[in-house]
Amino acid sequence: MTGWYPHVRGHRDMHHMLSPEEACLLKELKDAGYFVLWGGKNDLLRVDDLPNAYSRFIERGAGSPWGESPWKPEDRLYYSFLYGRLPDGYRTPDDVWTDEAAGFLRGGPPQPFCIYLPLVYPHPPFAVEEPYYSMYDRDALPPLAPTPDFSRKPRLLSMIRERARLEEVTEQEFREIRAVYYGMITKTDANVGKVLTALRAGGLWEKTAVFFFADHGEYAGDYGLVEKAQNTFEDCLTNVPLVVKLPGETPSAGAVSDALVELVDFYPTVAELAGLPHTHTQFGRSLVPVLKGETTTHRDAVFSEGGTLDEEEHTHEQRRKRKDIYWPRLSAQNLDHRAHGKAVMVRTHRWKYVRRLYEMDELYDLENDPQELTNLSEDPKHAGVVAELSARMLDWFLTTGDVVPYEQDERWPGEPLGDDSDYDE
């Protein structure tokens, strides 16, 4: 929403949202005359700044997205996030938000418009109603990534696994988790489909751009884990879907691209399509050339980051009681802040390198080890790869380390800033 990486302005936790003076795509669209309909959760702005980002806000209008846990705290699967089958006809906030968005389109929306739907699903706990619950044959699913050598992985993962009793979860139970996760994804497809159908029915399809993506993935059984961690970077967490439809007809319609892209690229892509002015320094790259089939490459490396400093008490997530299903991860993070320490990933098509502030680094050969099971970071034969990717990481930090506002400040009262229209070479 800004074209910034988390480190640019310190947005590295769940409790420091964008400030009113910071860039935000939704606010810029609204200022440019777009009617902005917001239906979904808020992981973006401070509450007092929310009204500046929408023209209409759809209230939640439903209960828990996941129903109630079927387990007691002492049960073996209590921390597995597996809630299972919801009652037939169960209505979630996602149903409300997408129904309202579809109705908005059928009613003849103001022009131009932007619909922003940050849905909950398929975020765990893992729960969904029929027909989605039984849609995927548990025995026909692709194999899950095996349990790795956790001594070569960040220790937060083994701490979570032990506290959540995940060693006691069977292969079939992990496959149940994955099948329900797939069902939640398919339900999300159906909910988004209602909005797309309304776009077509209202004659708006050809002149509307559509972006569908996720902010992160989940383990959902891979590596013997269930829920993401914020400073781990396996592809199941970071290689998220991105589906885009441009207005009108494009030669590349229906194509699938393996170009390396980042979520920061969303901002300049929408800004270009909407004709928004450049108001701040940002680090995304417009995807329009790739989307129009003008090029097949976009970036030669992508980055991700997460975690906190040991001494950053104000960034550590709130402690929870044992009855909270997030207790295994949050208690581990609070018991050992360095296990949740800062880390940065750089990924090319061939390699993934993770630099950790307090722990062993990671290096994976994605061509020969796509499941990221063998950490090569300390293998002397790959020292050159580590050095090359470390240099790329340093260049990235130097390039994106801060932003200077476009608007200059006066140094003395009444002193004009001047311009450079009259100058000597």
Could you describe each region identified by the protein language model?
Residues 404-419:
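Short, charged, surface-exposed hinge/linker loops at domain edges
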Residues 1-351, 361, 370-391, 417-425:
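Formylglycine-dependent sulfatase
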Residues 365:
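A contiguous binding-surface segment within folded domains or other stable secondary-structure elements
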Residues 36-38, 390-407:
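Bilobed periplasmic-binding protein-like "clamshell/Venus-flytrap" ligand-binding domains
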